């Protein structure tokens, strides 16, 4: 019984015991990883320092699942900031943000080589290494560094340098997307071009990917702010007397920057959606205009066909009384033209009625769709009919005397309004 308790106690105290108890062999974790190592003063200790994954896990007390956050694979991994290891000198912070994959310890930091095929990411990583070296150099006397309350701990200074580089990268990408999309949107305001629509589609896809990337980074920072335990674990050394205010202000400031970038990207996407809707409306209107023109041409063609039909009947080699008269030619031409014009006028009138959108009652729609001359004739007939009925009223009764002129005046005003 004592041996089992001693064995359990040894597993808790030994951070390297997990590697043997989980049956992970060097053959399984034999791949190599390379990293650039900086010490607490910003001095480069190792450049492209290579080590096997197995040795790396044993040295830092990590689990194989933690390799996913720093594995230099081309597969995009969700951004993360995780505290790992046991209390004391074995504590570390795993950071995976965009092109930066780092392991932060209390006295050094490892920046892993991503070996990305994207040249821009490789260039950004090289610039970050140069910036990190300058930011970690002590600007005050190292002997007084631990007594100066304005200086952040080493792990927080490294984390801040990473966040500064990430926010700068996001802001730079956003400005590129804004410049490209604004040029396309301004061009679409003048005229709708097929090539510009294709460029707008590509730009919309790019800004959507950027928006998703920025949202993930903002969510990581918000999760840190919501958990006091996670914020406390970011201190790898001694905890300050003022509590978590220092690290909380640090994470909160960059969380706000990430949120601003997300909002700007969201506004751009909304602008693109509005432009797409307007373009669709314009395209639909042009399509409807072309269809209307086609219908008008078809109607005119039908009118000519009616006239041609009459001419074809007259041109048949059959005897009839028309050919013996002098007015036959004029009569046939007149009938053909009149028939074609009537058919064309009737079909165009029907097409005009179809274009009307009923906003009120059917009676109002039918009245509005009638030609002005026809409305005037109908109003005149109604007025005469009403006046004839009024003339037939028996005016011999005393009550009706003297009121005929007033009633007639009112009816005249009503019929005038009706017209």
Swiss-Prot record:
The secretion signal range is none
Q: Topology in the membrane?
A: Multi-pass membrane protein
> What Gene3D superfamilies does the annotation carry?
2.40.128.330, Magnesium transport protein CorA, transmembrane region (1.20.58.340)
User: In terms of domain of life, where is this protein from?
Assistant: Eukaryota
Annotated TM spans: 297-317, 328-348
The short sequence motif called YGMN sits at 314-317
Could you list this entry's UniProt keywords, alphabetically sorted. Ion transport, Magnesium, Membrane, Mitochondrion, Mitochondrion inner membrane, Transit peptide, Transmembrane, Transmembrane helix, Transport
Q: List localization entries.
A: Mitochondrion inner membrane
Record bears the keyword Metal-binding: no
Name a single GO biological process.
mitochondrial magnesium ion transmembrane transport
Q: Which GO terms describe its cellular component?
A: mitochondrial inner membrane
- Pfam families from the UniProt entry: MRS2-like
One Gene Ontology molecular-function label: magnesium ion transmembrane transporter activity
Key word Cytoplasm present: no
The family annotation for this protein states: Belongs to the CorA metal ion transporter (MIT) (TC 1.A.35) family.
Function, as annotated, reads:
High-conductance magnesium-selective channel that mediates the influx of magnesium into the mitochondrial matrix. Essential for the splicing of mRNA group II introns in mitochondria by affecting mitochondrial magnesium concentrations, which are critical for group II intron splicing. It also suppresses a variety of mitochondrial intron mutations and its absence may disturb the assembly of mitochondrial membrane complexes.
What's the subunit arrangement here?
Homopentamer. Forms homooligomers. Interacts with MFM1.
This protein's name: Mitochondrial inner membrane magnesium transporter MRS2
